[in-house]
């Protein structure tokens, strides 16, 4: 290795141009230019830079300089001045570099050459300004006419003549906004492999002799992503610090030569990014607001242990610059931005975001990062990044991530442009921007995503939009459902903790985890199935419909995954789901129906039969009875009549009674399903044997007769699904004959009936309006409909009686309305309608009695009193011969106060019916008496919640004895002995008690007494 004394001194005279025009503002920086050298062999007009003179030390050798020049890490930058380099995006300046073994000459100082060219500079200053302006406009117009950028491979030419550009040292260079790009593992990989850094200075054999130069390339700025990756390899461009910041770089002793580094160990860093970005030529410039400037990150030198040991440079020598890039890719530069694109992204304002808003955005970012992470895991790093960039939502929401560290956001003032109307247009515009350079993106997205820009702000502005939130949650849920847990036990514990939280979002997360466990780890749920079902069932009644809907769906997933293991939990879940079937929200009803269907399909059929019968058949809500009958019908079809009728006698009797109850329900759809199930049993031969073994009730015979006479509706279509057809009975002639289409308009019939048909049309509209009010969702509208029906019964009784079934199909549910005000008002109004309608109510009598009897157990005193008033009105106004079978058939299905009230009315009806038709009393009332005497205990109470019935049984037996006489004991002789004995004791004690009360209080023996405490045994 030679010494510095071996280097001969050389002196070169170089013209220096001083530009006196206006200089745009740039960041503040050091003012002293270090000596440098630029390749003089570059063609004029394409970036040939005139170097400043430099005196070479006597002891410097060209070989040392050449070895130091071979590595980019050896380049040293002193504090640059604020001049053309900062304005055009060039590095500040370079030291003089020795390239080859050519003789070196000393360069004169800039001060000695400034006076020689000052006179020429002043003369051409104004002329040059005008010429540059005209040529810049021409270049801008040519670029706008050629948006595609022209064919690749055409070299760029300066808009200033060669001599002028050489004198002014001005090379127009487009400089993009360099975003903060973090370090990546690829950079360290290149260092370890020892690869040469791309863009290094060529060897001496490639340069002309006698030249001291450094090539500055546009390759990094203009080549596309693929070529950039090939040219830069794994080089990571570090963040560019702001003013007054020191970049941590490998340092050396000031004044010494840069020591050669091993290949691949040089790390390129740079000063602050220029504030102007120029298009090709002297086109229009786009200024970047301060809020979008990249923030400094940790220097990549921290990853190099060897470099960390070196002392830091002083501030004046601390920042090397990017150099040694060739001009090869400059020929493939893209054309400048279009005018509308420049206007769109040029106008921006500063918006301050509060701390709470930033926290909400951070929460949103966490969800987005979780979604992207789930989608990126199965793929490699290269494929992962390309797919992330191709995703619409990930691309549009990239601008959210840098908001974590700052409280400001750059928001364009133009938000109604045409490119914001469609996401695809935005993506196409972003991808096809010709003047934007291709900058390699870090592979750690979206955590280190690019800053917010004009094309990524729609995601910010639509933050909290229901559409975005719903899509994101659905995608996240779908992504999680397909993936099993790495630790299922821990996932179950976390899910239960989330469900116990008071936050609805945590509850939703817990429910999604339960769905994942049910789909992928069903064996884990088996151990804690009861706890899981209990917690999930509790969320079905959540006031937030979103959580309730998700809980209902989760129950359906549990049924599908665990199947027969859910038998023990089916009853409680079925009650909860049936309760939700009466919800006003249709999507809740659909979800509950799907979960019930999943229960019927997966649990044991016998268990489904018991659950639906106990939870739905006896429910007060008609909608719940309807849906219970629907699913019960599906269960019966799967079991089959053969197996159902092969059970014990008690179970078969209970099943038949339940089906008869459904077949006589007030809701027409429930009646349809009930008759359908009875028809299934009737079609089997064992049903006849069942009828012979057990005495069929009057209700069963009536239902069977109706089925045989009318049959089941065709095509298994619900009556309500057929829609409300036009009432044909209203559109008839006066003589009852229907109107024929072939009848002439001038015929004698039609002329006489025009006024009548017009009045009938008004009646049809009136009935339609009445039906709409009775079935309205608002309780005030339903109360108004009940009032209109009462007025219509008073004013137009014939109209109501002619369409009684259609009217009462809408009115009967109001007698059991979920709203207490509507329920009580309907009962009170119906008590007033009964004397007006009288015998016309017989077709609807059974369904009305079922509904009214259920109200007798109401805890509301007003509803109970109104129901009792309806019973009394029916006994007084209706035909007792028709009323007796209906009331007697309901006693066995009643409990509580309803049994006492209905049995007390039976004792009254016996007195009026037996003289007219004794067979009716013997057939319907005597079985009720035997039932009471057979099941009553010694103290006169029935098992269950019915209470003490001694008083009503005594009145019933005395009423029967008064009208039947000794025939009552004759019928009792065929019953078990304890029944006969109990009846005799009851009659004797009643007669003695009545005589004693008549003697002591002066009350007639036949007066009604209730609440007697005498037991059934004799004294």
From Swiss-Prot:
Q: Which InterPro entries match?
A: ARM-like, ARM-type_fold, CLASP_N_dom, TOG
User: What Pfam families does its record include?
Assistant: CLASP_N (PF12348)
Coiled-coil spans in chain = none
GO annotation, cellular component aspect = cilium; cytoplasmic microtubule
Region listing for Disordered, in residue ranges? 28-54, 131-158, 249-311, 991-1019
According to its UniProt entry, the protein's GO biological process terms are:
microtubule cytoskeleton organization; negative regulation of cytoskeleton organization; negative regulation of supramolecular fiber organization
Q: State the family it belongs to.
A: Belongs to the Crescerin family.
Q: What is this protein called?
A: TOG array regulator of axonemal microtubules protein 2
Species in which this protein is naturally found: Homo sapiens (Human)
Species lineage: Eukaryota, Metazoa, Chordata, Craniata, Vertebrata
């Amino acid at each position: 290795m030679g010494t510095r004394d071996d280097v001969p001194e050389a002196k070169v005279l170089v013209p220096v141009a001083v530009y006196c025009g206006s200089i745009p503002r740039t960041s503040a920086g050091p003012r002293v230019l270090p000596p440098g050298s630029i390749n003089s062999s570059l063609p004029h007009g394409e970036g040939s830079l005139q170097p400043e003179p430099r005196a070479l030390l006597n002891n410097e050798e060209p070989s040392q300089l050449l070895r130091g020049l071979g590595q980019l890490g050896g380049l040293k930058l002193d504090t640059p001045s604020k001049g053309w380099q900062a304005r055009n995006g060039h590095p500040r300046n370079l030291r003089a570099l020795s390239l080859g073994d050519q003789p070196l000459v000393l360069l004169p100082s800039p001060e000695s050459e400034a006076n020689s060219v000052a006179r020429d500079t002043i003369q051409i200053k104004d002329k040059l300004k005008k010429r540059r302006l005209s040529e810049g406009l021409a270049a801008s117009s040519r670029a706008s006419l050629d948006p595609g950028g022209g064919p690749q491979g055409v070299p760029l030419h300066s808009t200033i003549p060669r001599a002028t550009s050489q004198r002014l040292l001005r090379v127009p260079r487009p400089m993009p906004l360099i975003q903060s790009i973090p370090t990546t593992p690829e950079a360290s990989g290149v260092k370890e492999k020892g690869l040469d850094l791309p863009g290094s200075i060529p060897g001496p054999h490639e340069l002309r002799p006698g030249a001291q130069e450094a090539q500055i390339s546009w390759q990094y700025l203009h080549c596309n992503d693929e070529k950039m990756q090939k040219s830069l390899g794994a080089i990571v461009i570090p963040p560019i610090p702001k003013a007054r910041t020191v970049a941590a770089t490998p340092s050396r002793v000031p004044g010494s030569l840069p020591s050669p580094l091993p290949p691949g160990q040089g790390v390129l860093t740079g000063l602050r990014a220029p504030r102007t970005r120029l298009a090709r030529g002297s086109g229009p410039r786009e200024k970047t607001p301060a809020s979008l400037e990249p923030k400094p990150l940790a220097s990549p030198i921290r990853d190099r242990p060897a470099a960390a040991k070196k002392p830091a440079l002083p501030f004046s020598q601390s920042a090397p610059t990017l150099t040694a890039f060739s001009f090869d890719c400059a020929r493939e530069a893209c054309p400048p931005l279009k005018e509308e694109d420049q206007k769109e992204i040029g106008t921006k304002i500063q918006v301050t975001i509060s701390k709470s808003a930033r926290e909400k955005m951070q929460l949103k970012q966490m969800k987005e990062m979780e979604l992207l992470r789930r989608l990126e895991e199965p793929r490699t790093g290269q494929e992962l990044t390309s797919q992330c960039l191709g995703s619409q939502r990930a691309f549009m929401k990239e601008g959210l991530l840098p908001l974590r560290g700052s409280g400001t956001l750059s928001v364009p003032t133009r938000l109604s442009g045409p490119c914001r109307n469609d996401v695809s247009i935005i993506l196409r515009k972003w991808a096809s921007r010709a003047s934007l350079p291709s900058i390699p993106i870090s592979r750690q997205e979206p955590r280190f995503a690019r800053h917010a820009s004009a094309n990524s702000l729609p995601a910010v502005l639509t933050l909290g939009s229901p559409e975005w939130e719903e899509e994101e949650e659905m995608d996240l849920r779908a992504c999680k459902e397909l993936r099993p847990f790495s630790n299922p036990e821990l996932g179950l514990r976390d899910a239960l903790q989330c469900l116990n939280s008071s936050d609805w979002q945590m509850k939703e997360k817990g429910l999604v985890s339960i769905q994942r466990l049910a789909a992928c780890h069903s064996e884990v749920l088996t151990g804690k199935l009861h706890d899981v079902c209990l917690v999930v069932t509790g969320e079905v009644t959540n006031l937030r419909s979103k959580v309730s809907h998700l809980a209902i769906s989760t129950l359906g997933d549990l049924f599908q995954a665990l199947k027969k293991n859910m038998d023990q939990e089916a009853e409680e879940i079925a009650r909860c789901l049936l309760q939700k079937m009466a919800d006003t929200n249709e999507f809740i009803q659909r979800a509950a129906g799907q979960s019930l269907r999943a229960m019927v399909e997966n649990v044991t059929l016998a268990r489904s039969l018991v659950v639906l019968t106990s939870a739905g058949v006896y429910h007060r809500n008609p909608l719940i009875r309807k849906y219970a009958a629907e699913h019960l019908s599906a269960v019966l079809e799967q079991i089959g009549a053969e197996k159902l009728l092969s059970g014990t006698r008690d179970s078969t009797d209970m099943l038949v009674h339940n089906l008869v109850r459904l077949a006589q329900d007030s809701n027409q759809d429930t009646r349809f399903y009930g008759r359908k199930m009875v028809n299934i049993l009737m079609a089997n031969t064992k049903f006849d044997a069942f009828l012979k073994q057990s005495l069929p009730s009057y209700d069963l015979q009536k239902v069977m007769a109706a089925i045989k006479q009318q049959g089941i509706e065709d095509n298994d279509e619900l009556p309500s699904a057929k829609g409300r057809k036009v009432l044909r009975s209203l559109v008839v002639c006066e003589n009852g004959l229907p109107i024929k289409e072939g009848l002439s308009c001038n015929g004698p019939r039609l002329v006489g009936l025009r006024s009548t048909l017009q009045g009938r049309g008004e009646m049809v509209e009136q009935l339609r309006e009445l039906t709409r009010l009775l079935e309205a969702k608002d309780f005030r509208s339903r109360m108004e409909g009940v009032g209109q029906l009462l007025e219509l019964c008073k004013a137009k009784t014939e109209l109501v009686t002619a369409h009684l079934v259609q009217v009462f199909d809408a009115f009967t549910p109001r007698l059991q309305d979920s709203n207490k005000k509507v329920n009580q008002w309907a009962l009170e109004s119906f008590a007033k309608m009964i004397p007006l309608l009288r015998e016309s109510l017989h077709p609807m009598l059974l369904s009305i009695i079922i509904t009214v009897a259920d109200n007798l157990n109401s805890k509301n005193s007003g509803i109970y009193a109104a129901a009792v008033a309806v019973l009394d009105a029916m006994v007084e106004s209706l035909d007792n011969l028709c009323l007796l079978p209906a009331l007697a058939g309901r006693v066995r299905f009643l409990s509580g106060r309803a049994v006492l009230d209905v049995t007390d009315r039976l004792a009254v009806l016996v007195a009026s019916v037996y003289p007219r038709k004794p067979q009716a009393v013997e057939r319907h009332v005597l079985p009720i008496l035997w039932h009471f005497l057979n099941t009553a205990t010694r103290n006169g109470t029935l098992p269950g919640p019915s209470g003490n019935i001694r008083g009503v049984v005594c009145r019933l037996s005395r009423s029967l004895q008064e009208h039947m006489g000794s025939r009552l004991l004759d019928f009792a002789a065929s019953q078990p002995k304890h029944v006969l004995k109990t009846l005799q004791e009851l009659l004797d004690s009643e007669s003695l008690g009545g005589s004693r009360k008549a003697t002591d209080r002066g009350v007639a023996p036949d007066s009604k007494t209730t609440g007697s405490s005498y037991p059934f045994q004799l004294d």
